[in-house]
């Protein structure tokens, strides 16, 4: 029979069934992770030195198999998914035989046959689970191969069977009767296990391990990462000779330990050397049979003992072996407690969670087998699956020595790694045994440190400014930079930069200085950085849209001579010296220019730029890059990338990312054209690529996170790569192998895909890999080889970078960080190196592969994030006592941050924590998940146990992006819900949360800008249509986005072009505006007239609401129950008191005691109150003031209906029980504009086409509900407010007000729009006083509408007062204002929000004039009548009051101080 025949198989019948042994359950679970994997096959072959009678051997085998119960079973699953063991007699299986003596290498042919048989998966539901072969390799040399699934036998069980086969074969051969096997029964093992689990010993063992691993120590492995067991493994076998083995045994006796404990000590020391970990946790397989009936039963009972030991470099072999011996003596008595159960106990199941690391399997079995007198040797083929590394040690018989086989998971290590690990282990073993009292750290294996060299630079290195100057002189007419329809030639660019350099020199800026550059993306930004460099100074880029606190922190670190920025952002920099690029210099500075010294060209040792990264100390750190490093990088990267002057390169990154250095300087130094992307280019991936095609882009330099989405879209056919693109460069974080494979299949090798790696400290990029290389295997994503002029050394697995591209160091005094720059003694001449903290390995092809980090640093969307910096921001929150942040790698390869917070009292709302962090940190550093704990876990040394926190992070299942989803295009009645599910599934995947419901606002779940881009891209692919990023911002719930997309689809089918002049009302709006028939005055006792003792107030933490609260407490004696969005009453109260302080409202302690804070949520049924509390408030509150609402000028009705309309319905239901008066705060914007109605009555309004945006619509619907309630006899009032401005007393300004948003956007740029002629402005303190008097002063009639309208304020007067205050303004039509504002400052922050509001009206209005915001005459007769005789009068809004508002804005930084003064004289002293 040929050795290439199929592997042995068969079938069998099932009879009864039995539960699996605990050890078998672990094997079963592991097999289900990959049912077709052969990893759980275990096998040996016995080399028999002598003739073998194959027929007798076959008889002996059948005899032993028949008497071995574990080999006559199958494994089945019941309807509940529970596995069972059933009887399945082996039956007619056969011994495979083959004569291989004719093969060129019979022994090799036999091993090859075994490899093929081992690669066949076993069907556990069929019999048999084993196989045997007898292979003849010489006339009297045979190999008996026996393979069995690990669920049936462990290694010791396999040895029992082998010994029994030798015994039976010998008896049959010599003609003696076959003795009884002496095997025990499986039933006895099962009974023993049951008794153990019910015993006190089980509990004692459990307690021992739970205590030993309570802190869940980190698991250190040379790979630095995890992977599932592969279907194969790398193996390297070395025999330790008899003399070496005897020396080992002798030293062990001298040390009073066993030889296996010496091997364990050396292995632990070797892992300590490779990982630097202070604790090593080994996986030690144990028989678990001593003193057990299983000692004579072939079965699977093997367990894993996690051996935890501290290792230091100063340990000697004597000390470490003794420590391990003590640990073993402590743990072995508890070895029966199952390893799998301990992992469950410690919540270390799934994901990256591990209990122990590399395995050391010591097999001292007596294996002296003789077959009819002929000797044999046993060779292990496979000991089972390999998670990471396994060191298998076989004690061979008759003094033959030890065999050491190192097995490794090929998904984590290559063959070179295995060789290095084994040789290092044996080298350390030899030295340690020779000097057992010498520190093991001194015996560190002196393996040659591998150094990769990028080779020489292609020619002399020239300064970047010199290269750009040459292009300006020689190719001055060529386009250097394009942006949004504008372009500038090299001559113009260099001339503008030179003018700026002279301007800076006039301010005494030059060599040795740093200039901060906070300029939005565009031509001005490129001019700014070149101008700074030409002045001799270094530039420090800042994100102009970053929170002010963040910018202040970076400026404190950078210590710039001045700040270059646009007028729109100048106010953010306080009293620092500022140069406004969009404004001419003051005359004094202009006059100084001719006498100023000429700019001095920088020297190679001067700084070129300072760029900030996240810092391990909790503060960002500025990395200083010199001109020499920048020039070397440009020379090496330009050569490696093949960039030339004919290329057109997208400038994608913001300046404060160091990728911008690569984009800008490589392009300009090559004489190519830099095309600066616009904001709308990234609305969708297809849109981005279409724009690239229109712009004739040939070279794309993209963040890896964005490229992931681009690769996905291209691979699915949702987008196409422009034909002009010839090179794509990616970098910033590890590329996902799945995305790389998609790209290769879709794009092939026609376009170069370069994967770059490099920390900021090595000037952007240090290594590059060609991912389009067809020789790369699927899933292989190297980071490549060093750039020319750069070298890379790998020391104990950590990457060190060498060369002239290294940073000067860090800004300021940073000893811990500066230690990363140091001479590398392991390399010849000890050159200066940067220790990256990145773990890598060198593949067989000589290229680097990234493995992970050696510290806690994490990459999120290209941002380097040190947890300490996020933790520092968290601890600044008043409601946080302690905090720790960990990075979580999800199943699909994406990453997120998880914050673990110990609250200081009641837990603050997660949304408030996120708001706090957004004010201090970049968006990518705001954690996606926040978990509250009573305390943080800590190690025995008192440090935060980050491994325990990582294990506690929510184990989120992320759906497969390729998984089948319901067809969103199917025409069914459930179309909308199907589409909702599709949208929710994509959000769930990207946000990495357990679930996203149709009504979840994804921004409340932590969505960030890059994730919105990802979702827009994946929905475009899934729905086979373009989904724009802006739509996701406008429709933040799956339900609303589904409705919006459906409406668009219907309009497209109906070919509605153009859209009607006035948008129709949302289809749900009119239905929502119908009051439930059961809401009507009930039979309860009606309220008594007069001021109530208890008032329910919603919205007390808002601008109007906090003043209403103050007025209720001042003018009445009532208790005020305030509903507040908060997790607890204490947190709700804290929010109220904080709001009072912010608005400078001072109340007596007596008044404050009348505030009752109730946690609630207007967007939930019954306001989020439980039935009991809702009923109590219904019974006890004598009036309801419904002021709370979600106010947004951008959001659609569907996202506001719950909080604004449905909450009103719930409060009407409360009011109806006892006819409790309900006073509703509405808005004059519900009224039709002047074009539809010349007058606004004090009456309820019918629907009209002026209800254009969600907030209007939600308030109108609520009024309709109140109108119907009034018709049924319920006492209600409606208070419509116009523009509510700050209190007359303090001049406080509500920055969220729409008009103030317009002023914040336009005043710094010196431009304001013509919006309307006039509108009502009412101070908030007057509104509060009037509303409380009108609502509670007397029992109202069944329905009264109050239009709170005062004397109108003319917008032209407001603009005049602004100019009088000191702001030079140009007034212009809205369309012009929008265009100039977008061009002068970019669409960022408040500017972006304001512009987005007007953008949302474009389809429905005349863009030349904008939306119609004017109202007709506002009737306020009811207000006048109601306030008559009360003494309440509204103060006028005049120049003095507006000046007080402006004083407040300047003081708080809402607006910049006018040029030449620090504010109006009326500004209060500080």
Swiss-Prot record:
Residues 974-1049 form the Carrier domain. Its EC number is 2.3.1.-, 6.2.1.-. Its cofactor is pantetheine 4'-phosphate. One of its GO terms (molecular function) is phosphopantetheine binding. The modification O-(pantetheine 4'-phosphoryl)serine is found at residue 1009. Keywords: ATP-binding, Ligase, Nucleotide-binding, Phosphopantetheine, Phosphoprotein, Transferase. The keyword Nucleotide-binding applies. It comes from the Bacteria. It catalyses: 2 a (3R)-3-isocyanyl-fatty acyl-[ACP] + L-lysine + ATP + 2 NADPH = an isonitrile lipopeptide + 2 holo-[ACP] + AMP + diphosphate + 2 NADP(+); 2 (3R)-3-isocyanylbutanoyl-[ACP] + L-lysine + ATP + 2 NADPH = (2S)-2,6-bis[(3R)-3-isocyanobutanamido]hexan-1-ol + 2 holo-[ACP] + AMP + diphosphate + 2 NADP(+). GO terms for biological process: antibiotic biosynthetic process; lipid biosynthetic process; secondary metabolite biosynthetic process. PROSITE patterns: AMP_BINDING (PS00455), CARRIER (PS50075). Belongs to the ATP-dependent AMP-binding enzyme family. Nonribosomal peptide synthetase (NRPS) involved in the biosynthesis of a unique class of isonitrile lipopeptides (INLPs). Catalyzes the final step in the pathway, i.e. the condensation of a (3R)-3-isocyanyl-fatty acyl-[ACP] to both amino groups of a lysine, producing isonitrile lipopeptides. Can use (3R)-3-isocyanylbutanoyl-[ACP] as substrate, leading to (2S)-2,6-bis[(3R)-3-isocyanobutanamido]hexan-1-ol. Contains 4 domains: a C (condensation) domain, an A (adenylation) domain, a T (thiolation) domain, and an R (reduction) domain. The T domain acts as a lyine-specific peptidyl-carrier protein, and carries a lyine residue that is transferred to it by the A domain. The C domain catalyzes the condensation of two isonitrile-containing moieties to both amino groups of the lysine bound to the T domain, a rare activity in nonribosomal peptide biosynthesis. Finally, the R domain catalyzes a four-electron thioester reduction, releasing the product from the NRPS and forming a terminal alcohol product. PANTHER family: BETA-ALANINE-ACTIVATING ENZYME, CARRIER DOMAIN-CONTAINING PROTEIN. This is Isonitrile lipopeptide synthase. The lineage of its organism: Bacteria, Bacillati, Actinomycetota, Actinomycetes, Kitasatosporales. The gene is scoA.
